[in-house]
A protein has these predicted regions:
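C-terminal substrate-recognition/cap domain of FAD-linked oxidoreductases
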Residues: 25-33, 215, 219, 230-233, ...
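N-terminal flexible segment immediately upstream of the FAD-binding catalytic core
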Residues: 1-62, 79-109, 262-274, 323-347, ...
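FAD-binding subdomain of flavoenzyme oxidoreductases
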Residues: 100-254, 458
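Activity-critical C-terminal alpha-helical subdomain
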Residues: 179, 430-464
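Short, ordered loop/turn segments at secondary-structure junctions
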Residues: 75-78, 98, 138, 260, ...
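N-terminal accessory segments
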Residues: 1-37, 67-69, 308-324, 414-419, ...
Length: 464
C-alpha cells in the first residue's frame, strides 16, 4: 500500500476502535490544531485523534507505531517553543478530552488528575479543599497538566516550591508502542528502584505521553506580604534577596526583578499602569512572602525592608496595603503580554545561569548586539531568585531576529547557562541545545529516544 492507503486504513481502524467522533480528518481539522502560541510555522496535521482515556492513547500509539505514522502530542497549545506545532506528515494526538480531577486526598494532600485538565481547574479544586497547588502561569485557564509536565513548567513561585518536577509524585504514561507505564506513586518517600516518572517530566513528549498524574498539594497560608522595591545596583538585588531569605526564610514565594529597560517601557506603553515611585531607578524587585501568622509576618517583612532601606541596599520601597496594590504591582511584572505587539518583530529568550553571572552576561549581550546590529531595545526581567532571565530584544528588523537568538544563546553557553530555563526546547530551540549540553549528554538523550521510541514516531524533530 502507498502512504495514502496506509493512512486511510489507520484512520478507519482508529475510528472503529475509538468511535468516529474521536477521529477528525480533512475539513474537520480546524486551524486551532495548526500551531501553538509561538505562532511559528503553522501547519495543520493530517488528522486529529481525541482519546478519552489512557487505554485510548495506548490504542492510538500502538497502531501508529505499527504503521510508522509520526505523531505530535497536543494539549492546550500554550507552549512557546513550537513543540506542539505539527510538522509535515504528522497526526495530532490531542489530550483535550482527557480532562478532570479524579480524586483529592486531604489527608495525604495529593490530587490526581487527567493530563488534559487545565491548570486553573486543578488550582480551584485544591482551593475548594482549603489547600494550594502552587504552580501558577498566566495561561492557567488554557494550559493543561500534560503539557506542564512535559515541559517541566516553572512559574513565579519556583523559589519556594520548585518546578513541576518537584510537585509530581507519580504519573501514568504510554510509550510509543502502546505500552502503559503506570507509576501512580502517592508517597513522598519511595526508593523502590528507578524513579521512572523522571523519563517523562521535561522530555516534551519525546519518550512517552503522560495521561494521568498525582500532584502534591500544600496548606493555604493567610499571611501574604507584597512589596515593590527600587534599587540602584545588581549587587543590591542580590543583597536584598539574601536578607529576605535570612530574615523571612522559606516564606519567600516570589522574587521578581525588572531592569529599567523593561519597567520603563511597560509603564510608558501600557496606559493602565503607573509607577509608584517619583523617579526612575536602574532595577526593581517585586517581593512576595506567604506565612501562617499575618501580623507577625507583616512585622518581619516591614522590618527587613526597613533595614535594607536604612543601609542603602534599596533606595525606595512600597508595601502593598490592599489587594488592589498587589494586583497593580504584578500587572507591571506581567505587562509583557500587553506590549509584545508593539515590540514586533522581536527575539524572545528564556535563559538561566548563576546569579553572580547575570550582570556580566547582560553587559556582553548589550555590547555584542550593539556592535553588530546598532541600536537595540533589550527588555529584561526574570525570576532572579531561581536563576531565570527573560529577554525581549528588537532592532525593528525581522531579518535580525534569528542572528540575535544565535548570538545571545552563544553568550549563554559561554556562561555555562541554559538556553531554556522553563519554556522547553521544542522545535524552535533544538539547534541551540548544543550551547547548553555536551556531545556526550546529547548522545545519551538520543540513545534513550532510540530505546523507548525505536520507530521515532513521537514528537520527532523536537528537543534532539
Amino acid at each position: 500500500m502507498d502512504g495514502a492507503d496506509v493512512m486511510s486504513e489507520l484512520l478507519t481502524t482508529l475510528s472503529r476502535e475509538l468511535g468516529e467522533d474521536a477521529v477528525l480528518g480533512g475539513p474537520d481539522v480546524s486551524d486551532k490544531y495548526a500551531v501553538d502560541v509561538s505562532g511559528e510555522n503553522p501547519l495543520k496535521p493530517i488528522a486529529v485523534v481525541l482519546p478519552r482515556s489512557t487505554a485510548d492513547v495506548a490504542t492510538i500509539l500502538r497502531h501508529c507505531s505499527e504503521a510508522g505514522q509520526p505523531v505530535v502530542v497536543q494539549g492546550g497549545l500554550t507552549g512557546l517553543s513550537g513543540g506542539a506545532t505539527p510538522q509535515p506528515g504528522e497526526l495530532a494526538l490531542s489530550l483535550e478530552r482527557m480532562s478532570g480531577v479524579e480524586s483529592l486526598d486531604r489527608a495525604s494532600m495529593t490530587l490526581t488528575a487527567l493530563s488534559g485538565t487545565p491548570l486553573q481547574v486543578i488550582q480551584e479544586a485544591a482551593e475548594e479543599a482549603g489547600l494550594l497547588f502552587p504552580l501558577d502561569l498566566g495561561a492557567r485557564g488554557t494550559c493543561q497538566l500534560g503539557g506542564l509536565i512535559a515541559t517541566n513548567a516553572g512559574g513565579n513561585q519556583v523559589i519556594r516550591f520548585g518546578m513541576i518536577r518537584n510537585l509530581v509524585l507519580g504519573l501514568e504514561a504510554v510509550l510509543a508502542d502502546g505500552t502503559v507505564i503506570s507509576s501512580m506513586n502517592r508517597m513522598l518517600k519511595n526508593n523502590a528502584g528507578y524513579d521512572l516518572k523522571q523519563l517523562f517530566i521535561g522530555t516534551e513528549g519525546t519518550l512517552g505521553v503522560v495521561t494521568r498524574a498525582v500532584l502534591r498539594l500544600f496548606p493555604r497560608l493567610p499571611g501574604k506580604c507584597t512589596a515593590l522595591c527600587a534599587l540602584d545596583s545588581f549587587a543590591g538585588v542580590v543583597e536584598l534577596l539574601r536578607a529576605v531569605q535570612a530574615n523571612i526564610g522559606s516564606s519567600l514565594s516570589a522574587y521578581e526583578v525588572m531592569w529599567a529597560s523593561y519597567f520603563d517601557y511597560v509603564i510608558e506603553h501600557v496606559g493602565t499602569l503607573r509607577s509608584p515611585f517619583e523617579r526612575t531607578y536602574p532595577l526593581y524587585a517585586l517581593i512576595e512572602t506567604e506565612g501562617t501568622d499575618t501580623a507577625h509576618d507583616a512585622e518581619r517583612f516591614e522590618s527587613t525592608l526597613g533595614s535594607a532601606l536604612e543601609s542603602g541596599v534599596i533606595q525606595d520601597a512600597v508595601i502593598a496595603q490592599s489587594q488592589q496594590d498587589v494586583q497593580s504591582f504584578w500587572a507591571i511584572r506581567d505587562g509583557i503580554a500587553e506590549i509584545t505587539s508593539a515590540l514586533m518583530p522581536y527575539a524572545s529568550l528564556d535563559v538561566s545561569m548563576a546569579v553572580a553571572d547575570m550582570p556580566g552576561f547582560l553587559d556582553q549581550v548589550d555590547e555584542k548586539l550593539a556592535a553588530r546590529f546598532g541600536p537595540v531595545t533589550n527588555l529584561v526581567f526574570g525570576h532572579v531568585g531561581d536563576n531565570n532571565l527573560h529577554l525581549f530584544i528588537t532592532t525593528g528588523r525581522e531579518a535580525d531576529v534569528d542572528p540575535i537568538l544565535d548570538a545571545v544563546y552563544k553568550i549563554t553557553g559561554d556562561y555555562q547557562g541554559s538556553v531554556s530555563a522553563e519554556h522547553g526546547i521544542g522545535a524552535l530551540k533544538r539547534e541551540y541545545l548544543h550551547y547548553s549540553r555536551s556531545s556526550e549528554e546529547l548522545e545519551l538523550m538520543r540513545r534513550l529516544k532510540r530505546t523507548l521510541d525505536p520507530n521515532g514516531i513521537l514528537n520527532g524533530g523536537r528537543v534532539i
